[in-house]
Amino acid sequence: MPTFRPKYVTFDCYGTLTRFRMNELARQIYGAQMDEPKMLHFLKNFEGFRRDEILGVWKPYGDVLCNAVERTCAKHAIPYRHEDGIAFYNAVPSWGPHADVPAGLSKVAAEIPLVILSNAMDEQIPSNVEKLGAPFYRVFTAQQANAYKPRLH
């Protein structure tokens, strides 16, 4: 019986391999302005607005995040500061992997080439990939594809 061996193994990066820390940063920036129930609602809206921003025509991820932060702040009657939106974008390259990711990825990479398909910008992703602790055959970004995942049309 033949054994199936994939040519590549593909991964998303943010949230799957890299610990996606948007909520932590939102709490850091806005937590003092609201109680916990309101914060949970803020975080839910922020996630929804980020998703909504990627479903349309492609735009740079910095715009996606700034627009999502601005929309969330407006919904919660919190003043929006552009520098806060930019802080989310600038934080992304500093995020590292989930604790169990590097060892597992290294084992797989020894046998099968790894590929990332990410909703990232070209300038951001190298820092995140470097922190994963395994070699990647290819890394493809939303910027290169001129589209975000999921693409519904």
Protein language model features and the residues they cover:
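Short, conserved clusters of charged catalytic residues that mark active-site
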Residues: 99-100, 153
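A short, structured active-site edge motif that brings together acidic residues
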Residues: 42, 135-147
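Short, glycine/charged-enriched secondary-structure capping and boundary segments
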Residues: 23-26, 129-133, 153
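Structured loop/turn residues at beta-strand edges in well-structured enzyme cores
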Residues: 4, 110, 134
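Alpha-helical structural signal in soluble globular domains
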Residues: 28-29, 71-72, 107, 131, ...
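Substrate-recognition element of Asp-dependent hydrolases with the DxDx(T/V) motif
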Residues: 83-94, 101-130, 140-142
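N-terminal helical cap/lid subdomain that shapes the substrate entry/recognition surface
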Residues: 2-99, 121-123
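Conserved Lys-Pro-Asp/Glu-containing loop-to-beta segment of HAD-superfamily phosphomonoesterases
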Residues: 147-153
